[in-house]
């Protein structure tokens, strides 16, 4: 438990919001699975081994529209049909599972039914400047995706796939940016896949 608490001290330094997640993550970490924390305020993804050891932290691209809840009516829609208001990265606790996208690329499903995943940076229209946004120090510049958590390809291959993208998956906590942190962190986990 001490290793978990020590590792979570690193999460707490990411933003003030991350401090409130320490107890739920420490409790869940006892189940032997790796876990990740998406800090939307800081636009980062932190990945931990099952024992609480920090495996890595990286900047992340997030949903274009700020918000903590999935937009009603957006579940099950084709990603390209989502409106600007539906392009959120919802807060919560999720049971993540390794999987493939429609192009056969390895991803980590956060919520399969909502087409929400962690994946590597892929080619996109030049006007979106995704690679530039990913390196920006301003977290607001990181708002561009349909809702997925997008990270540098090297980090995805080196940290995400070996931990969350193999075996039984893990837990992903997406911290709220507007709601109190414990309201979104607790409760029943949401399944990544049907």
Task: List the predicted regions and their residue ranges.
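N-terminal signal peptide c-region/cleavage motif recognized by signal peptidases
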Residues: 11-14
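Bacterial N-terminal signal peptides that target proteins for export
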Residues: 1-4
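Exported/periplasmic cell-wall-interacting domains
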Residues: 87-194
